[in-house]
Swiss-Prot record:
Disulfide bonds: none annotated. Transmembrane segments: none annotated. This is F-box only protein 21. Keywords: Ubl conjugation pathway. SMART domains: YccV-like (SM00992). Interacts with SKP1 and CUL1. The gene is FBXO21. The keyword Nucleotide-binding does not apply. Pfam families: F-box-like, Transglut_core2, YccV-like. The keyword Signal does not apply. It comes from Pongo abelii.
């Protein structure tokens, strides 16, 4: 069935006839127009690919104008998929008709896979091997990514399940590509000092759905460099940095000339552009992402230092990164070239503190403690990235218990890409996956690796192995889908249905119901910890699985819920897993959820009619 759909869709682009049909009466006026005019008409944007295919079959002249590598099919491709044009060079020879067909086929294949995910993975997190279908597809990866982006950009509140799985697939594909790029980057020799490139890989990995590129970030930095040069020209119109061409630089030797650059930088960054250290919201991951530092013009010491360092080096000032405890710094050499230097031959720059220049003693005052000379030394790219990822790791551990721990998962991936044998972090990763109930097979692989690296971890490893194997066995024992019918006598007390927008009477949060039980199905410990016995109806009442607007999933007693008289969308990341559409008053379950609650939708319609229609009538009166 799916294959037939693909074949049918491919017929949208008719094959060009080997022999053009004889000229048809009425075409003579058209074909006698100058070629440029005909080409303009065919590229006007009103004609579809099918139209072009049919036009090209009418006569030899039109067929030649619609040749595969010409402007007509290029325009068809551009109009249909404009975001892909940046991947083509104006000098490249491209068979645009063939490119159109390949892109169309890739899109159909991508949609077929996205459509299959809900049925395959509704009851569990998408496993590690769940993305193998996408990885094994033939054709350019950018075409599949582009189709996924098209799905995510579909307008309106429909296709929520498609968007949910398209987002997961795109997230995975981009992260895999970025991680491979980062690993290749880390194999560069030690003298390869592109700190910005490494920082951008970290930014991209943690934000794979954002359009972040080194080229764009470098362009923004280049624009800052231009402003610095403008200021520098007012200080010293003959300054050698002004002669540097874009993308080229060399180091300036004279300290006075270097000082002029730093003065101009400080004026532009902190006075003109108003960059500043983020003291008010220091523990925010956005402070570590370079694209956000440039947008928000704020960051923490390490991200501000990397920006400052990049600009200074482009203008010929050889600053170096210093992995100073609690406060990342840059150092600026004041000694003669080739001389034996110690820590007192440097000035230390605090990019977080508006480019303030510090002595060794002032650095100690900055953090309130004495440190050894070794901590004033320069560090390589890998150590800088290690500190950035370490900061993200610390922030990830702060995430609330109801969150997906995505930042912690991403930062663990990045850290272990740099240091794959860190036993404690491997153990943390295994525990995290175990806690989230995802990827049990991967958990076993991690635990086996830990046991090989450090047999002394046998106790912790053994505990996790045992419980992970039990989890796998329970999954194997799971029978078919449990169907809950509202008409069943044991469900007579259930008042609400999946898809309804509710409000918690006590805590005031908004939520949507995605499941229910006739009585509380949690264990005794949970019931005791949540003080369920203090409720008037205790645990002998229906309980509802709800997605809450703060991103959490909760289990709420019926007596604590009420209809939300002002229903609104619930901005929960898992809404698309259960629902296909938001109507403005309620959510419509997707096919998989409806199988489990086949009678709920009819009840939802009745409830919406009674609650919201009555409200509208009262307002009209």
């Amino acid at each position: 069935m799916a294959a037939a759909a693909v074949d049918s869709a491919m017929e949208v682009v008719p094959a060009l006839a080997e022999e053009a049909a004889p000229e048809v009466a009425g075409l003579s006026c058209l074909v006698n127009l100058p070629g440029e005019v005909l080409e303009y008409i065919l590229c006007c944007g009103s004609l579809t690919a099918a139209d072009i295919g049919r036009v090209s079959s009418t006569c030899r002249r039109l067929r030649e104008l619609c040749q595969s590598s010409g402007k007509v099919w290029k325009e068809q491709f551009r109009v249909r998929w404009p975001s892909l044009m940046k991947h083509y060079s104006p000098t490249d020879y491209v068979n645009w008709l063939e490119e159109y067909k390949v892109r169309q086929k890739a899109g159909l294949e991508a949609r077929k896979i996205v459509a299959s995910f809900s049925k395959r993975f509704f009851s569990e997190h998408v496993p590690c091997n769940g993305f193998s279908d996408i990885e094994n597809l033939e054709g350019p990866e950018i075409f599949f990514e582009d189709e996924l982006v098209c799905i995510l950009n579909m307008e309106g509140r429909k296709a929520l399940t498609w968007k949910y799985y398209a987002k997961k697939i795109l997230y995975y594909l981009r992260q895999q590509k970025i991680l491979n790029n980062l690993k290749a980057f880390l194999q560069q020799p030690d003298d390869y000092e592109s700190y910005l490139e490494g920082a951008v890989y970290i930014d991209q990995y943690c934000n794979p759905l954002s359009d972040i590129s080194l080229k764009d970030i470098q362009a923004q930095i280049d624009s800052i460099v231009e402003l610095v040069c403008k200021t520098l020209r007012g200080i010293n119109s003959r300054h050698p940095s002004l002669a540097f061409k874009a993308g080229e630089s060399s180091m300036i030797v004279e300290i006075e000339l270097q000082s002029q650059v730093l003065d101009a930088m400080n004026y532009v960054l902190y006075d003109q552009l108003k960059f500043q250290g983020n003291r008010m919201d220091y523990y925010n991951a956005l402070n570590l992402y370079m694209h956000q530092v440039l947008i928000r013009r704020t960051g923490i010491p390490i991200s501000m230092s990397l920006l400052y360092l990049t600009i200074a080096r482009q203008l010929g000032v050889p600053l170096e990164p210093v992995n100073f405890p609690s406060h990342f710094l840059l150092r600026w050499c004041q000694g003669a070239e080739g001389a034996t230097l110690d820590i007192f031959d440097y000035i230390y720059i605090d990019a977080f503190g508006k480019g303030k220049q510090l002595t060794v003693k002032e650095c100690e005052y900055l953090i309130g403690q004495h440190v050894t000379a070794a901590l004033y030394g320069v560090v390589n790219v890998k150590k800088v990235l290690q500190r950035m990822v370490g900061n993200l790791l610390s922030l990830g551990k702060r995430e609330g218990i109801d969150q997906s721990y995505q930042l912690l998962r991403d930062s663990l991936d990045l850290y272990l890409a740099m240091y794959p044998d860190q036993v404690q972090l491997l153990l943390l990763q295994a525990r995290l996956y175990f806690h989230l109930g995802i990827w049990p097979e991967k958990v076993l692989d991690i635990l086996q690796h830990i046991q090989t690296l450090d047999p002394g971890q046998h106790g912790a490893v053994g505990y996790l192995v045992q419980h992970t194997l039990e989890h796998i066995e329970r999954k194997k024992e799971e029978v078919g889908v449990e169907v809950k019918l509202r008409s069943d006598e044991k469900h007579r007390d259930v008042c609400y249905s999946i898809g309804l927008i509710m409000k918690h009477k006590r805590y005031g949060y908004n939520c949507v119901i995605y499941g229910w039980d006739p009585t509380c199905m949690m264990g005794h410990e949970w019931i005791r910890n949540m003080n369920v016995h203090s409720l008037p109806h205790g645990h002998h009442q229906p309980f509802y699985n709800v997605l809450v607007e703060d991103g959490s999933c909760r289990y709420a007693a019926q007596e604590n819920l009420e209809y939300n008289v002002e229903p609104q969308e619930i901005s929960h990341p898992d809404v698309g897993r259960y629902f296909s559409e938001f109507t403005g008053t309620h959510y419509i379950p997707n096919a998989e959820l409806e199988i489990r609650y086949p009678e709920d939708l009819e009840f939802v319609y009745e409830t919406v009619q009674n609650i919201y229609s009555a409200k509208k009538e009262n307002i009209d009166e």
